[in-house]
Amino acid sequence: MLSEGYLSGLAYRNDIQWSYPSSNEQVAEEKEEEMEATAAASLSYSSVDETQVQNLYVSCKSSGKVISSVYSRESQHSRNPRITVLQTNPNPVYESPNLAAVELYRDTSRETYLVPPSCKSICKNYNDLQIAGGQVMAINSATTDFPSEGSFQYGPLLKSSEIPLSMEDSMFTQPSDLPPTPIQRYSSYWRITSIKEKNSLQMQKPISNAVLNEYLEQKLVELYKQYFMDTGFHDSSPTQILASELIMTNVDQISIQVSIEKNLEISKARDIVINRLLQYGSTEISTQSLHISQYSNVNP
């Protein structure tokens, strides 16, 4: 005679226990007891054959052991590479900084500046020339992204402690180190005025861009005055003498005169006068970046 039975429950493992497998024997025994109780409660009908119940229980028990063993192996295998990855790839935030950056940050009294390539020859040949403009890139402790020295493709790094001595100091201390340079007629005025005004410039530190530009413009005009005066008297030509006398006048007065004659603005007339001065064929000075040639390259 056939009888029907209903399966009110299935043997299963808890998801939390599956996600955290353990190799402890006590935990495994507790899981087995839980499976036995679940299977006994689910198959409580007397109409089901005892052999079928036993076979079902054995199959569930064996499948549970196989699944648990496979899962434990996979979990152990998956945990091992995570540990190695954490050991091989440390957090980049906690990496040790560059030694040069650390040394620079420790020594806050020494400033470091990025010198443009146009100033290489000037800093090398004229050690008494010191530029203190407001737009000079200073790298100090406030800099967050400190680049390496190899990334500076536009110029070298120049520290304030590496600036050599001034010209007069080096002449008194080490006169033999300076190479002998021929003294030109039109360079004496430039040398004398530069030495006289050097102390006045040092009194105004730090120099702003406006003061620096005004000083360079004044020195440029004075150099042109002396140059045209020397060449005019040397060639003994009336035109050169007249040209030198015109250059010796103030640039602002010439600009005002040109603006009155040509009905132009003073700023435009001033630009025309300066451009006209730059067209007089001097290979010694060129703009926009100021290049001063060496005395050995000047034709007497």
From Swiss-Prot:
Functionally, this protein is described as follows: Innate immune adapter that mediates the recruitment and activation of IRF5 downstream of endolysosomal toll-like receptors TLR7, TLR8 and TLR9. Following recruitment to endolysosome by SLC15A4 downstream of TLR7, TLR8 and TLR9, specifically recruits IRF5 transcription factor via its pLxIS motif, leading to IRF5 activation and subsequent expression of type I interferons. Plays a role in the regulation of endolysosomal pH in immune cells such as B-cells, dendritic cells and monocytes.
Can you state the subunit structure given in the record? Interacts (via pLxIS motif) with IRF5; leading to IRF5 activation. Interacts with SLC15A4; leading to its recruitment to endolysosome.
Q: What does UniProt say on post-translational modification here?
A: The phosphorylated pLxIS motif constitutes an IRF5-binding motif, leading to recruitment of the transcription factor IRF5 to induce type-I interferons and other cytokines.
The GO annotation for biological process reads: innate immune response; positive regulation of innate immune response; positive regulation of toll-like receptor 7 signaling pathway; positive regulation of toll-like receptor 8 signaling pathway; regulation of lysosomal lumen pH; regulation of toll-like receptor signaling pathway
Q: What is its main location?
A: membrane
Modification Phosphoserine occurs at: 293
Could you read off the lineage of the organism from its UniProt record?
Answer: Eukaryota, Metazoa, Chordata, Craniata, Vertebrata
Does the keyword Repeat belong to this entry?
no
The domain-related comment in the record is: The pLxIS motif constitutes an IRF5-binding motif: following phosphorylation, the phosphorylated pLxIS motif of TASL recruits IRF5.
Any single GO CC term annotated in Swiss-Prot or TrEMBL for this entry? endolysosome membrane
Protein's name according to its UniProt entry: TLR adapter interacting with SLC15A4 on the lysosome
Among its keywords, does the record have Phosphoprotein?
yes
Per the UniProt record, one Pfam family is: TASL
Gene that this sequence comes from = TASL
**What positions carry the motif pLxIS motif?**
289-293
Q: Which InterPro entries match?
A: TASL
Its annotated compartments are: Lysosome membrane; Endosome membrane; Nucleus; Cytoplasm
Keyword annotations for this protein, in alphabetical order, are: Cytoplasm, Endosome, Immunity, Innate immunity, Lysosome, Membrane, Nucleus, Phosphoprotein
